[in-house]
Amino acid sequence: MRNPLMQPWLTEKSTGLTEQKGQYVFKVKSAANKTEIKAAVEAKFGVDVASVRTVNCLGKTKRQFTRKGVLAGKKNDWKKAFITLKEGQAIDYYSGSTDQGEEKKSNKG
């Protein structure tokens, strides 16, 4: 499989997990397994992954009422990965780089 990471999952709950426990949440491909996810995070962000937990999320069922009857459908199933890093490491979602506990210098002048 190429790259199982699709996007970071940024919600209020996932941001709290990042701040409190150092866990990061990503939306990943449904066919991805834990070892593929771990390798992709380590390669993309250059960090050491301590553990990976995954959750399969079922897509919502949708119904549309028309004159001819009811049209039923379903959104796609997807998977979330909870990634815990080793102590002192962090991921910066927005730049794609890592922060190894060093403070960034500001260039205000």
Curated annotation (Swiss-Prot):
Q: Some GO term, biological process aspect, for this entry: which one?
A: translation
Task: Please name the SUPFAM superfamilies in this protein's record.
Answer: Ribosomal proteins S24e, L23 and L15e (SSF54189)
Q: Per UniProt, which keywords does this protein have?
A: Ribonucleoprotein, Ribosomal protein, RNA-binding, rRNA-binding
The keyword Magnesium appears for this protein:
no
A cellular component annotation (GO) from this entry: ribonucleoprotein complex
Q: Which InterPro entries match?
A: Nucleotide-bd_a/b_plait_sf (IPR012677), Ribosomal_uL23-like (IPR013025), Ribosomal_uL23/eL15/eS24_sf (IPR012678)
User: What does the protein in this record do?
Assistant: One of the early assembly proteins it binds 23S rRNA. One of the proteins that surrounds the polypeptide exit tunnel on the outside of the ribosome. Forms the main docking site for trigger factor binding to the ribosome.
Q: Which NCBIfam families match?
A: PRK05738.1-3, PRK05738.2-4
Quaternary state and partners of this protein? Part of the 50S ribosomal subunit. Contacts protein L29, and trigger factor when it is bound to the ribosome.
Q: What is this protein called?
A: Large ribosomal subunit protein uL23
Report the source organism: Prosthecochloris aestuarii (strain DSM 271 / SK 413)
Gene that encodes the chain: rplW
